Amino acid sequence: MAPKRQSAILPQPKKPRPVAAPKLEDKSASPGLPKGEKEQQEAIEHIDEVQNEIDRLNEQASEEILKVEQKYNKLRQPFFQKRSELIAKIPNFWVTTFVNHPQVSALLGEEDEEALHYLTRVEVTEFEDIKSGYRIDFYFDENPYFENKVLSKEFHLNESGDPSSKSTEIKWKSGKDLTKRSSQTQNKASRKRQHEEPESFFTWFTDHSDAGADELGEVIKDDIWPNPLQYYLVPDMDDEEGEAEDDDDDDEEEEGLEDIDEEGDEDEGEEDDDEDEGEEGEEDEGEDD
């Protein structure tokens, strides 16, 4: 597996909300305040003033970083477009990429993978000012699961700083709604399989309960989208495990052969010792005669 490359898009630093500093009691005005406490109070007031300056610089830095990111986000667009055109020439690129990603693959059931075989293009678009949100678009070929050609999910940050999301309504074909996966079989084995089956990947499009903690959206935007090739090229873990097992079997066979050879050498050594003892006995008998 090739080493993971550094993401071309660094996660957008979250601008801290300005928090009003607590009002400090003016104890310096108390004439009876002990000298030590008075010095501590003055130090706290000065620390508060310095901290306000630090916060002001942090806010200024965030604004300048945002401008730089906006500039380079525009410069990257032609390359993203060119990359999408090249990816379109590779069958099953995106489903392979998702299956090879450890976090995304944990959300995929067998039917999800089948549906994602019709996924031809993925695009992540950050809004003009970046900090207000982004959109992820999934483009599909004609498929037996739903009518939509494009499924999208948007993430917004409103003026108050509260995150929200909205998405395309999936127009499922009859009996193909993967978000309502169920089985009519009531035997224990079937129920066990149902329990182990992960929730459908497509429920992500209907889940808007906590947009600020949407891990899948963040993974696609900040990890997969900057460099999907690194996950497409990840070797199949099943093949790796199979090769490792074969290597272990070969090692065990070699060790077994070595043990057999060693036992054979020991047996030959014992036979030689017996022959030597026999010859010595014959010589002793001859001397006695």
From Swiss-Prot:
**UniProt keyword list:** Acetylation, Chaperone, Cytoplasm, DNA-binding, Endoplasmic reticulum, Isopeptide bond, Methylation, Nucleus, Phosphoprotein, Ubl conjugation
Q: Which residues carry this modification: Phosphoserine?
A: 7, 28, 62
- Give me the stretches of Acidic residues compositional bias: 236-289
TM ranges: none
Using the UniProt annotation, give all residue ranges assigned to the region (Dimerization).
31-77
Q: Where in the cell is it found?
A: Cytoplasm, Cytosol; Endoplasmic reticulum; Nucleus, Nucleoplasm
Q: Which residues carry this modification: N,N,N-trimethylalanine?
A: 2
Summary of the tissues where the protein is detected? Widely expressed, with higher expression in brain, thymus, spleen and bone marrow, and lower expression in heart, liver and muscle.
- Give the span(s) annotated as Disordered: 1-42, 157-206, 235-289
Coiled-coil spans in chain: none
What cellular component terms from Gene Ontology apply here? chromatin; cytoplasm; cytosol; endoplasmic reticulum; nucleoplasm; nucleus; perinuclear region of cytoplasm
In-chain residues carrying the UniProt-annotated modification N6-acetyllysine? 23, 67, 149, 171
Looking at the keywords, is Ubl conjugation present? yes
Describe the PTM.
Some glutamate residues are glycylated by TTLL8. This modification occurs exclusively on glutamate residues and results in a glycine chain on the gamma-carboxyl group. N-terminus of isoform 1 is methylated by METTL11A/NTM1. Mainly trimethylated.
Stretches of Basic and acidic residues bias are at 168-180
Residue positions of the PTM Phosphotyrosine?
A: 145
Q: Which family does it belong to?
A: Belongs to the nucleosome assembly protein (NAP) family.
**What does the domain comment read?**
A long alpha helix in the N-terminus mediates dimerization, while the earmuff domain is responsible for core histone and dsDNA binding. The C-terminal acidic domain mediates the inhibition of histone acetyltransferases and is required for the DNA replication stimulatory activity.
The entry's protein name is: Protein SET
